[in-house]
């Protein structure tokens, strides 16, 4: 059984939700590549921090609730429920004040750690 508290994907999402971007330096490679929809892909830890800052500014209650993690060698796959409220515009989505719930899959490939 996987100890969710120890997986990189869980720690990364929790740090992002909390606005603890200093933790990204420990968890992510400086040249991390994150593939994301809506033009939110990043190619460095600094860019990833910037996207999270913008996301939290638009959705202050943004949360990633990890439902399940499967680990296979250097791969961590997570099933995540993302919730929040669009208080301001972000990634082309207007700030409507409406809350949302999205099911998400996150797949990470770990290197050097």
PLM features: residue spans?
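C-terminal and inter-domain tail/linker signature
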Residues: 1-112
């Amino acid at each position: 059984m996987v100890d969710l508290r120890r997986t990189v994907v869980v720690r990364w999402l929790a740090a992002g939700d909390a606005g603890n971007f200093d933790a990204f330096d420990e968890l992510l490679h400086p040249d991390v590549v994150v593939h994301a929809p809506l033009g939110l892909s990043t190619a460095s830890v600094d860019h990833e921090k910037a996207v999270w800052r913008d996301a939290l500014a638009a959705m202050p209650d943004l949360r990633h609730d990890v439902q399940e993690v499967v680990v296979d060698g250097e791969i961590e796959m997570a099933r995540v429920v993302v919730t929040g409220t669009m208080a301001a515009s972000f990634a082309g989505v207007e700030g409507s004040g409406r809350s949302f719930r999205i099911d998400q899959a996150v797949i990470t490939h770990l290197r050097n750690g």
